[in-house]
């Protein structure tokens, strides 16, 4: 029985206990899938699970928990369960209200990498077959090696078949082919440069930010969208100018608000229309948090995030003597 059939079978067993279930469905577009909201058995057949399911459906958890009176089911990849764990650690919804259906993952494909490889050609169909991705454009057909086009997070994933939290787990017979690489390799390359070059690099990135708020809206941990500083008029924090200063202000505020909370799902970078490498910022924040507080977001929902706790003495932070 295929992974999709087993998923449908499991959902069929529990759907009566749920008011709504969020899963993946065909989008009608190559390389992409859509979220689907299922309320009865008639729509279960629309569920899919494949290498194009890159979206983190945990982004719907908080809003649905507020809006829906009954129980909620969410189909998640093992890495996505970290976002749920983090939300629970901040006591943002009742654990008993959420049914987590974790599906073992064999890696998901980054469609931006594929589009870059094909130099922007219009893709009209795509299909993952064994270790190959068959892509058809208007003029040509291509066979690409799947292992070369995984999302960056897949290369250092160590929980793809071992979700840290779930109610139902559907094991995937296909395993992730690549060995976890060096998680911080891109940061090390950037940080090997001098401070002036690093500053110049980020200025060049931030000036492209058009503040479409896609990064904020897709993030499962950015739950204060209706109270975001970008929408406040009194006080007025953010102007509508498009330049490196305003882009820097918005993105660094995001980093601060997500410090010790980001589970590094990469959704912010995935949806950015300007391809700003936002994951680098978030990984750096996570790296510092782990070093100072020995804490990794999304690992244990019983452990409070460092910025929601207070200690008289932090063993990894030395106080500066004031002269």
Task: Describe the residue ranges of each PLM region.
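Iron-sulfur-associated redox domains of electron-transfer enzymes in respiratory
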Residues: 1-200
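Generic secondary-structure signature for well-ordered alpha-helical cores
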Residues: 16, 159-162, 211-214, 267, ...
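Active-site-adjacent beta-strand anchor residues
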Residues: 74-77, 209, 271
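Helix N-cap / loop-to-helix initiation motif
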Residues: 77-80, 215, 277-278
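Short gly/pro-enriched beta-turn/loop segments at secondary-structure junctions
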Residues: 149, 200-204, 210-214
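C-type cytochrome heme c attachment motif
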Residues: 152-156, 211-217, 261-271
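Ferredoxin-type iron-sulfur electron-transfer modules in oxidoreductases and energy-metabolism complexes
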Residues: 178-207, 221-323
